[in-house]
């Protein structure tokens, strides 16, 4: 859905296949469906599309104007990209990019479900609700094996239930 470059004003540009995201959102909502989108706090997403780095407010405003209901915000693409982070081993360096986007999302009149994806690093279940995220990935990616499903879906989740509550959930992938 995303173009290779942003618009001259810095807002997200769409590609020729998805020329009107607001109309798409309206179409989905008219049918009782929700509208979700994917981005990253980095320069690029996992798929090498544009991330939200240094455009968080513009992107939050754009998501609101399109009628977005769900944002998956994926660490992939962020990594070591932001020059203001002094130490990657501090929990604060993992919280900062998510808290920054969350503040901009909460300024919007639309309620956007905020899903953090950073693969359980720095025990996100301990701070995800603190930054008012709705869900957070607790593990790495699942694979198409019973062993992976069992490990991620059951073994690694058993002690995390205390961190889930209404409006805030563990996401085992």
Where are these regions (language model features)?
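Generic structural hydrophobic/aromatic packing signal, biased to beta-strands
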Residues: 35, 63, 101, 114-116, ...
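Short secondary-structure boundary/capping segments
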Residues: 9-11, 53, 98, 128-136
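Extracytoplasmic, non-cytosolic globular domains
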Residues: 67-70, 75-78, 83, 87-120
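Extracellular/periplasmic catalytic domains that process cell-envelope and extracellular macromolecules
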Residues: 28-30, 64-65, 106-109, 128-130, ...
């Amino acid at each position: 859905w995303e173009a290779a470059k942003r618009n001259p004003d810095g807002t997200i540009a769409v590609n020729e296949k998805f020329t009107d995201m607001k109309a798409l959102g309206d179409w989905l909502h008219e049918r009782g469906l929700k509208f979700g989108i994917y981005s990253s706090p980095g320069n690029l997403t996992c798929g090498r599309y544009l991330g939200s780095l240094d455009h968080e407010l513009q992107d939050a405003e754009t998501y609101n104007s399109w009628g977005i209901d769900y944002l998956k915000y994926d660490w992939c693409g962020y990594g070591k990209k932001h020059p203001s982070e002094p130490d990657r081993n501090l929990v604060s360096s993992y919280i900062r990019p998510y808290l920054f986007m969350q503040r901009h999302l909460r300024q919007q009149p639309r309620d956007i479900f905020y899903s953090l994806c950073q693969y359980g690093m720095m025990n996100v279940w301990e701070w995800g609700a603190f930054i008012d995220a709705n869900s957070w990935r607790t593990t790495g990616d699942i694979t198409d094996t019973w062993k992976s499903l069992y490990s991620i879906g059951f073994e690694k989740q058993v002690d995390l239930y205390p961190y889930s509550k209404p409006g805030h959930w563990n996401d085992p992938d």
